[in-house]
Amino acid sequence: DPTPEIFAMSETICSEDTFDVLPINGDPTAATIVPLGTTYTWSVLPGLEVTGASDEVIPQNSVNITTDLINSSNIDQEVIYTVTPTSDQGCVGPTFELTITIEPRPIISDKTDAICSGDTFTLSPTNNAPVEIVPANTLYSWVIQSPNTDLTFLTGYSAETDQPLISQTLINTSDEVKTITYIIIPNTGNCEGLPFELDVAVSPGPFVEDIVLDPICSEDTFVVAPITGIPNNNIIVPAGTTYTWTVIDNL
């Protein structure tokens, strides 16, 4: 009866994924012997920052992990399985190693920011594993969501794909704060993270054109209280706007 002869194998997966490896007779070379009905048991040497790996003493039809392997770091981790193949006739082959590389998957929580109209916001998430996992070279794609805010008076925003950071210059031409919500998907290589939200509150900036008053008499007072939209739509006076001034003498 033939005895299984299987050589070292490897597989790469993303964090939180499972794997299923089935050795094939004659693959990758004719030296690989996998009799029909071969089963497998294994012991595992887990990576320091990987959970979900375990030994298997009950013979299995393939080398598979039905529990997610989780990489809690922001770099690749390896798990090494020492596998014992046994033919259906009870012939035990030499052990072989199966190395599983677990690539990190980005995990980023929701964020907020606040800027003034005309300013640029920039978000570059930083790694704080295992709470927030940001592998090197993570890219970001996003769309705009505005479920509770009218964005008519907000400009400068757009959906983007595969950006190294999240950054846009936003202009608010209304007289009230506008909040825009970005739905962002982080991606590292082949490993895509769950979407997270970024809320950016954009405060309006006052804009008042030069004002010329009618003449007044000596010892009279004058009051100027600019109003949004008067005398034209260029005038923006957010609630709570205050003023300072200097005087130019007209000699």
How would you name each of these model-derived features?
Residues D1-L251:
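Extracellular low-complexity Ser/Thr/Asn/Gly-rich intrinsically disordered segments
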